[in-house]
Amino acid sequence: MKNTSAKSIRRTLTTLAIVAAGVSSGGARADLANGIVDQWSVGVVAQFLCGTVVWTGSAQSCAAQTMSWGSGGVSGLDITNPAGATIVNTNGPSVPNVAITHRNQPITGSTLDEVKLRSTLTLTPFSPPDTGLPSASLDFLIDFQETPNGADPCANGGVNGVGVNVNGCGDIFVIDQGALNFAFQYDLGTGQGAKTYFISFFEQTGGLNPLPVAACNAVGVTSPCLGFVTPESQSTTFNFAAVITTKPVEIPVPGTLVSVGLGLLLLGRRRRA
């Protein structure tokens, strides 16, 4: 049985500190009165780390944004990154960024076993505009199980031909589970000191959930585990989004579920010149 903590990418929170000395402006503008950044430019870029991929047999196809495997049919994973940075309002609604699609087809032969995915985050004050924080990256592990389509019950514990198993047993992904809120600080130089913000990442489509014990066991990880089960003979897309708040998010934002992906602790301090 795999151990999720041992198999994880040694989830070490990345701490970045940026201190820029300067002379503060003679008087704070009205939009700086509360010292809060109202809008952020958020850049998120995801890629597969092909050097980390493990196949169940012979090597298959892997590139930064797409993976494919199988004989007699082709299954795979595709990453769709946003065209550019998105604007996120502080204490506003979640804003979509990265999407991941599983192309699930009946196959034989070698399949994906595991791969690491790297997410890189860049935060820049947009309103009022100011200098951005350095980019920070985190690698996290995806464990995958290509399940026998004809089993009953299925590897996920469900009944074959019902629900997600309607076309045969669904395949199983397990993803390193992240915390809900990641804190960072930014100082606009208004004389009020650095303000603390929290960035949280959510899966919007309702597919990311705690998995049954049977599904965790099938992948070879300990329960509880977090992941997806995807239907056979379909392409399923999971959409992720970000929110930035001035208080920790304690309940899911409407239209979202559990947070996942980037586990970042960004400590940024900047003085306006």
Regions found by a protein language model. Give the residues of each.
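A short, hydrophobic C-terminal helix/tail in secreted or cell-surface proteins
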Residues: 252-269
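Short, charged juxtamembrane terminal tails flanking transmembrane helices
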Residues: 271-273
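Short linear Ser/Thr-Pro motifs
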Residues: 24-25, 256
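Bacterial N-terminal signal peptides that target proteins for export
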Residues: 2-14
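Mature extracellular "passenger" or substrate-interacting domains of secreted, surface-exposed proteins
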Residues: 31-250
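Bacterial N-terminal signal peptides
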Residues: 14-23
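Sec/Tat signal peptide C-region and signal peptidase I cleavage site
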Residues: 26-30
